[in-house]
Curated annotation (Swiss-Prot):
Domain of life: Bacteria
Organism: Legionella pneumophila (strain Paris)
Keyword Ligase recorded: yes
Assigned protein family: Belongs to the SAICAR synthetase family.
Record-given protein name: Phosphoribosylaminoimidazole-succinocarboxamide synthase
Keyword Cell membrane appears in the UniProt entry: no
Enzyme class: ligase
Reactions it catalyzes: 5-amino-1-(5-phospho-D-ribosyl)imidazole-4-carboxylate + L-aspartate + ATP = (2S)-2-[5-amino-1-(5-phospho-beta-D-ribosyl)imidazole-4-carboxamido]succinate + ADP + phosphate + 2 H(+)
One GO molecular-function entry: phosphoribosylaminoimidazolesuccinocarboxamide synthase activity
Pathway membership: Purine metabolism; IMP biosynthesis via de novo pathway; 5-amino-1-(5-phospho-D-ribosyl)imidazole-4-carboxamide from 5-amino-1-(5-phospho-D-ribosyl)imidazole-4-carboxylate: step 1/2
Signal peptide positions (record): none
GN (gene name): purC
Length: 312
């Protein structure tokens, strides 16, 4: 197995550790390091080779591909695992955009619909929809970014509760739908369906609304294979996907990932399969070949060298 990036320790500003990304604060700029940590159940399950590189470079590809729709926070990419970004004031709302009614978690649109819910996040859904059906047009089902847990919220509540102004909501929601429409079109050209995703927006030092965090990555989005979708849907079968669900299921079968203090180690073949799926998705999404590091070694050393070279 090649070297995995699970922890970073860089001599640049204050460090904030997220589930997957480590962020270093340079004042008006941020160093965003995407690691190979694979998280689920609110904890780190494993380290997946090349995952951080795939997520970072997929996001960078989309940032460049969508800058004519909305400006974004990206400044530079000094290393495959690293993005330098403008520090922005982030809106405390996640913009979840859905093109299909799907999902299996307790908060998913399909789970709520099955329970008889027909109004969700201020949107009214008709009777008679089937799981994995394409919606008449994409919808935004926003959630709040809160300490304990995010909660679904309607646009009216977002403004009434003071999360955002009406003007800011109108502008960001318009951007979100344009980004998703473009993402669906590009994905289809590459043999994929962009099912749903989430966006985050902020305001930069000049007062402009910009896209932040990540865009259309395998972690923030769900993708299905385009070929065969309609036939499988008509037959009542699940769409073919390339995602990490099988790793979650392995842990559920072998332990209680919510309660067990120590988790079993995932089999190496499972990790290799997941790494290859991430790389396959990168190549399908971008239409570009994945470039493997020609000088494998400690990733931290490479990152430090590349950032120092960029900083001059």
């Amino acid at each position: 197995m090649p070297f995995c990036l699970t922890e970073t320790s860089l001599p640049f500003g204050k460090k904030y550790k997220g589930k997957v990304r480590d962020t270093y604060d340079l004042g008006d700029q941020l160093i965003l390091v995407t690691t190979d940590r694979q998280s689920a159940f609110d904890r780190c399950l494993a380290a997946v080779p090349y995952k951080g590189q795939v997520l970072n470079l997929t996001s960078v590809w989309w940032f460049k591909n969508t800058q004519s729709i909305v400006p974004n926070h990206l400044i530079a990419v000094p290393d495959p695992n690293v993005a330098i970004a403008k520090k922005c004031k982030i809106f405390p709302i996640e913009f979840v955009v859905r093109g299909y009614i799907s999902g299996s978690t307790s908060t998913s649109l399909w789970t709520q619909y099955q329970k008889g819910v027909r109004e969700y996040c201020g949107i009214t859904f008709p009777d008679g929809l089937r799981k994995n059906q394409k919606l008449e047009s994409p919808v935004i089902t926003p959630t709040t970014k809160e300490t304990l847990h995010d909660r679904p919220i309607s646009p009216h509540e977002i403004v009434a509760e003071g999360w955002m102004t009406q003007e800011d909501w109108d502008e960001t929601s318009s951007y979100a739908l344009k980004l998703f429409q473009h993402g669906m079109e590009v994905a289809q050209q590459h043999g994929l369906i962009l099912v749903d995703t989430k966006y985050e927006f902020g305001r930069d030092a000049e007062g402009r609304i910009v896209l932040v965090d990540e865009i259309h990555t395998p972690d923030s989005s769900r993708y299905w294979l385009f070929n065969g979708y309609q036939e499988r849907f008509d037959a009542g079968k699940e769409p073919e996907n390339i995602d990490k669900e099988f790793l979650r299921l392995w842990f559920v079968d072998h332990c209680d990932p919510y309660k067990d203090e120590v988790l079993p180690q995932a089999p190496q073949e499972l990790i290799v399969t997941l790494a290859s799926r991430y790389i396959q998705l990168y190549e399908m999404i971008t239409g570009e070949s994945f470039v493997y590091d020609s000088n494998p070694g400690p990733v931290n050393d490479r990152i430090l060298h590349n950032i120092q070279r960029w900083l001059g």
